[in-house]
């Protein structure tokens, strides 16, 4: 069977940066370490006044196509995953195609376009759709452009405000991919949950503490479901484990449970038993509560062991390096985590060709998905072509007052667009260019 997977990746960050420890924490009267240590975040990315989900997605896709020497004829579908859409009918992919048609000679009239919604897991679902389309043989030799783009804003004063972010990840899904081949095996954990939702409103209704528990519960189901088709997972199976990363502290919790689950009945559990005992087993307890308490105590000790720390530092921590600087990108977050881990490997001269990644996506509402990916021989060139460090370094750092201004500019209920002043000059990129006759958003390319 021909390999199908991710052939190219581009990351586009919002051009503004809010420093959480230096700027946000003092304004909120918080200890900076709540952000840097507790949540694991240093900064958030925000879109400048002329940026939005369309410009970030189109700019990422444009760079990807230019770099790969592609024309619209090479693209058979454009799927956008977002939970920040501004139109309940016309998909964001049409706006992005419209942007790209301004800079390419050909059009995308032949391309199937759509928009995927299931909170943050929709980016992974769009990759799935592209994978299935290619596997079904309906692609006529073409590739799919998958764009995960979000402006993750919370109402001011919401606890989620600390985890905001904005950016897009564009991915090319093709036969014989250069970056990773996707496994056929997948695991799902999906349930009707009300942890985080936006019932026809821009800013989410969030039960933050519960959302953390729902993430863990659905992820646990997805891991078990994956094991039911792919076999029992051992912690050494995966060289990197990119998770959906609303904030790195969330991944720290998920990773501890993943490690605990995958060392059970292995030589690692036996080796650790000398120091911290074996994992509690439910049959040894009279009540669920006593079992859960004992598991909690075991986990607290487990994460302090050298074995766990070594595993975490090698397999999980590298996937969090970009996220720490940009915050939550919702649909793009797990794809940023994958890119971050690969970038770390490249910078540390690791030979990853043939290595296996375990990719764990999550979307509120709620669904987790787990699959494996095999790193392909072209990964180094692809990851070396990313300019994400340059983009991060060039961000304009906003004061708290400027943050409040830009938050208002992007608030759909506030009429600030007319006088919205940008903090950075646009150059060589698509920009928001006002409103059209039917309430549509308009875009133009700035040389
Ligand atoms: N030094 C070190 N650590 C500190 C600290 C300090 N001074 N002060 C606090 N901390 C730690 C806390 O102990 C806590 O860590 P633990 O959870 O490990 O105990 C962490 O920092 C955060 O502190 P709080 O729990 O007090 O923070 P909070 O209540 O203000 O907000 C939150 C946390 C509820 C997750 C909030 O950020 C939120 O609502 N976020 C949005 C929802 C979200 O991202 N949920 C994640 C799962 S859902 C999902 O993944 C989908 C999605 O993308 C939204």
Where are these regions (language model features)?
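Long, repeat-rich segments with strong aromatic
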Residues: 236-254
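Phosphate/pyrophosphate-binding loops at sites that engage ATP/ADP/AMP, CoA/4′-phosphopantetheine
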Residues: 60-76, 220-239, 256-260, 278, ...
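Condensing-enzyme catalytic core mediating Claisen C-C bond formation in acyl metabolism
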Residues: 1-51, 160-224, 369-447
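Conserved catalytic cysteine-centered active-site region
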Residues: 32-51, 85-143, 149, 154, ...
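Acidic, glycine-rich active-site loops and adjacent beta-strand->loop/helix elements
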Residues: 10-13, 81-87, 117-122, 147-153, ...
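Catalytic phosphate/nucleotide-handling subdomain of diverse soluble enzymes
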Residues: 339-392
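Flexible glycine/proline-enriched surface loops and loop-helix/loop-strand junctions
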Residues: 153-155, 199-208, 235, 318-320
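A short, small-residue-rich loop immediately preceding and capping a beta-strand
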Residues: 76-79, 140-150, 355-361
